[in-house]
């Protein structure tokens, strides 16, 4: 499976993505807002990548390629919850928004799902802006929803309905 945007390719993960994905998941800057601490070993990332690959077509989850280099992931590890992470070297270019928009458009075009969801740390202002720019609406707050490396994190919950997504441009980079 492959989705192309103006700058990116979102595709199914492969075993040879291991080192590139490890570069993302082992970087403390990238995982600051992630649901687990940075990966310490390549084996830890291998287990994560194998689970991503085993998820199959019912859970469209993609690695993100920029100019032939894997720089992150975006998609739906658990339907209907969207998740995304990028290597810090490519932050600030609108790539996360472009990738998430493409993944969202794909799911609404190919799945019988009415609402997509997201869970974001209230301190992650960039991710909150991204979700809101894509039309996600805050639906709630949860205290101590994630235990990441022994530290409890809160969550803002977001949702995007199919009805609100109709008519939005597909896979365009944000302005």
Q: Which residue stretches match the model-derived regions?
A:
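Short loop/turn motifs at secondary-structure junctions and domain boundaries
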Residues: 52-57, 136
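Non-catalytic, surface-exposed connector residues within folded enzymatic/regulatory domains
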Residues: 42-43, 58, 152
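A generic membrane alpha-helix/interface feature
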Residues: 45-47, 53, 153, 172
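A generic secondary-structure signal
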Residues: 51-52, 106
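Hydrophobic alpha-helical elements and their junctions with loops/disorder across both membrane
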Residues: 20, 37-38, 52, 125
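Acyl-donor (CoA/ACP) binding surface of acyl/acetyltransferases
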Residues: 1-32, 61-175
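Conserved GNAT-fold acetyl-CoA-binding loop/helix
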Residues: 29-51
